[in-house]
Amino acid sequence: MTFKPSTVALALVLGAASSVTSVSTAWASDGCGRASWYALTSRTASGERMNPAKLTAAHRSMRFGTKVQVTNARNGKSVVVRINDRGPFIRGRVLDLSKAAAQDIGMIRSGHAKVCYEIIS
């Protein structure tokens, strides 16, 4: 059985594109970086009113409603938050947590912390 060079080239390009997509998707779903917290009461990007007492967070691209486990890298404390807003808009930050979520993982005083996060649903 023989294949035309153009068919082989197309298969290679499509195969490479699909592997790049899966790698970038995996990278976007879990990671580590700096998180901050906020306690505004304005409307979020999802349309709901921000409630600092709820376990919510902002992320630049995760779907609204996504549940994410966030762990403070310094003390190992974790919290599960629901993505309901967009942000953070400060370079180098990966998440903006509600005040309640920040309190649960012990980062109120510092205002920001290194965290690792993982999508759980």
What are these regions (language model features)?
Residues T2-S121:
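Secreted/periplasmic proteins
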